[in-house]
Every structure is written in structure tokens, then in C-alpha cells.
A protein has these predicted regions:
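Typically disulfide-stabilized, N-glycosylated extracellular/lumenal ectodomains of secreted
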Residues: 2-365
């Protein structure tokens, strides 16, 4: 049996040594990368629900969230899903009803069933003081040419007595409708938000929400929406009920619903969910301290290099509240200690090219 010489043994060992060196270098690089990442929550608090980041003021455990920001993580599904925990205050109300005449789905007195569901989160951003959640979609589906089955969905943020920290963003969301002939309104209003047309089928175009098969409009002006319920009015008779039984009304983040003509046929949108943007603020008769004034003990802006902005949020839109922001040239989470970190513009020249160029031009030669 041929035995390798000492020199051959050393050569055979080189690939193994090289792999160990490369693995060690990769581990060190990963450790440095993690060390550079700023914290997003309080020390000792979990910051993930599956792959979803949970930044403070949101949190999963006692001591890890501000009042009103508790999140529950459902590990019974894969991947895990995150929900706002306070279902008495934040919830989706789903009401099923049947009707023989076209009307606003939210106005039907003969409800067959009402169910309540928690608000499911899509993501959260502490630096923008925003979150995204799956929003309400109201549908009306024909069971024959004159009979409809409606499902009305309403999102409620706050219990109507005390102001919650969340509101549906008026500027970052729109109200939309899908169907051959449907009028769309919000919160039972008699003011029409948008209307889809009744022209020939070829007039509908993928990606267009200009009225043929799909319409879209800004949310009506007013205070921040602490609750929102899209409503629809459909035709008295649906001659297309076999091929196009369903019409829809929704409140959705701008550009998140892209119209596709197959949505006019069948009931495929009943299985879809679309995000809405929620603004959040620190509430409880709270406002930013005046210049030179000592902040209150429960002041939420915990990081250095941050500033406070007064806000209005909640069911009435007039509750005293405020949000925290990282100062210019800083980023991160202003709601935790050392959460706002200096931006290294040189690492991101595509984002900060003009600033880097300006700073370079004033350097001494």
C-alpha cells in the first residue's frame, strides 16, 4: 500500500486549512456586520417574529413595548405572523349579508354573521413612525342576476373612548374599486369616492385604474382615520353574474394594488390581501416639551441625536400626541437609547453622492 510522503501530506492538508481560514474570515466579517447594525429594541427583548423585525415601541414581551404597541407572534404557521395584540381596540370586523337589491353593503340591516379578527402586521418602521397592516376589502358577489352576497370589512384602530396610537394614513393610502359597474365610498359616506364604468370589456386595461373595470381616488379629506370601512354600491341586475360575479372596494397603500383584467372574472380577489399604511404616535395627552423644558418621565424620544414633532392621530384626529425622529445625518430608532446612529455617507455613495462630493470639495489639499 502506497503511503503519502510528508510533503504530499502537507499538500493534502492545504485545502482543509484554506477552508478553515476562509470560514474564519467569513465568521469575522459576519460578526463585524452584526456589530455595526444598530439595535432596534430594548436590551434583552426579542426583535423578531419569524423574519419580521419588531422595533421598539413595538414589542412581544412585558417591558419590551410601550402601552398600545404590544405584538403577538403566531408560531403555529410557517412563517410566523405578527398581529396587534389589543383586539378590543384594534381589529378587523367582517360582516356577511345577503341582499336582493343593490345598495351600500355597510347599510344592510339583515346581517347573517359578524366576526372579529386581529389586525395583521406586514412590517413596522420606528424611524418613520409607521407600520403596514393588511387592510379591509369589501366584496359583493352575485349568486344569480339579482341576488348578492356581501362581505363588509372594517378596520378599527381605537375603541371610540380613548385614542389609540394608530391611524390609517390619509396621504399614503387610496380607496379603490374593481368591477364592471360599482360605486365606491368610505365609512358609509354618501359622497362617492370613485366609480367604475360599463363600457365594453376591451376598454379595461392591465395596470389602469382610470374607471374602466377599476377606479382609484384619494381618501376624502378630514382628520386622520382611526377607523375605515370601504363600501360599495353595485348594479340592481348583474347580467354577467356567471363570468363576473364579484365587485370589490378597498383601502390600500398607494401603488400596492396593480389592476389586472382577470380580477374582473371569478372571485379570485376574495383570496387576496393588500397592505395599508398606519401612522403611529405617542398618545395620552402628550406633546413635545417646549425648548428648555424638562421632558416628562415617560418621554418616548430616548436616543441622543433626535428631535420631537407634535402630531395628531386617532379616531378624532385631535388627540395630543407626538413622534420622535432621528436628526439629520442620523438614522435608526429614536425610541431607544443610542438608537440614532451617524450615517456613513461614503458607504452609500449612490444615496448620498451630492453630499459626499460637497464634503470632498472642501477638504484641504
Amino acid at each position: 500500500m502506497h503511503m503519502p510522503t510528508p510533503s504530499q501530506s502537507r499538500l493534502l492538508a492545504l485545502p482543509v486549512q484554506l477552508l478553515l481560514i476562509l470560514a474564519g474570515a467569513a465568521a469575522m466579517a459576519r460578526a463585524e456586520e452584526l456589530a455595526e447594525q444598530p439595535p432596534i429594541t430594548r436590551p434583552g427583548c426579542p426583535d423578531k417574529c419569524g423574519n419580521m423585525s419588531i422595533p421598539f415601541p413595538f414589542g412581544l414581551m412585558p417591558g419590551c413595548f410601550r402601552e398600545g404597541f404590544q405584538v403577538t407572534c403566531d408560531h403555529s404557521v410557517d412563517p410566523p405572523r405578527a398581529f396587534l395584540a389589543d383586539t378590543d381596540t384594534n381589529r378587523i370586523t367582517v360582516t356577511d349579508s345577503d341582499a336582493s337589491a343593490a345598495s351600500d353593503a355597510a347599510a344592510y340591516p339583515g346581517y347573517t354573521n359578524t366576526s372579529y379578527f386581529p389586525v395583521e402586521l406586514v412590517d413596522m418602521s420606528a424611524d418613520r413612525s409607521q407600520a403596514r397592516a393588511y387592510g379591509p376589502i369589501t366584496s359583493g358577489c352575485s349568486t344569480n342576476s339579482t341576488q348578492y352576497r356581501f362581505q363588509t370589512q372594517a378596520m378599527t384602530l381605537g375603541n371610540g373612548i380613548t385614542e389609540g396610537p394608530f391611524a390609517v394614513s390619509q396621504t399614503l393610502n387610496v380607496v379603490g374599486g374593481v368591477g364592471w359597474r360599482v360605486d365606491v365610498a368610505v365609512d358609509g359616506s354618501t359622497t362617492l369616492a370613485c366609480r367604475t364604468g360599463t363600457k365594453r370589456e376591451l376598454a379595461a386595461r392591465n395596470g389602469s385604474c382610470a374607471g374602466q373595470g377599476c377606479c382609484e381616488a384619494a381618501l376624502p379629506p378630514g382628520p386622520e382615520y382611526g377607523s375605515v370601512a370601504p363600501g360599495l354600491v353595485v348594479a340592481d341586475e348583474n347580467a354577467r353574474w356567471r363570468s363576473s360575479p364579484c365587485s370589490y372596494a378597498m383601502v390600500v397603500e398607494k401603488s400596492r394594488y396593480v389592476f389586472s383584467t382577470p380580477n374582473l372574472y371569478g372571485d379570485r380577489l376574495l383570496l387576496e390581501s393588500f397592505p395599508v399604511v398606519l401612522d403611529f404616535a405617542i398618545v395620552g395627552n402628550a406633546s413635545c416639551p417646549a425648548k428648555g423644558q424638562r421632558p416628562p418621565p415617560d418621554y418616548a424620544c430616548a436616543s441622543s441625536n433626535n428631535y420631537c414633532v407634535n402630531a395628531t392621530v386617532g379616531l378624532s384626529g385631535y388627540a395630543l400626541s407626538y413622534v420622535c425622529k432621528c436628526s439629520e445625518h442620523y438614522e435608526g430608532n429614536p425610541y431607544i437609547a443610542n438608537g440614532c446612529r451617524d450615517i456613513d455617507e461614503c458607504k452609500f455613495p449612490d444615496l448620498y453622492y451630492s453630499l459626499v462630493e460637497k464634503e470632498a470639495s472642501v477638504q484641504p489639499h
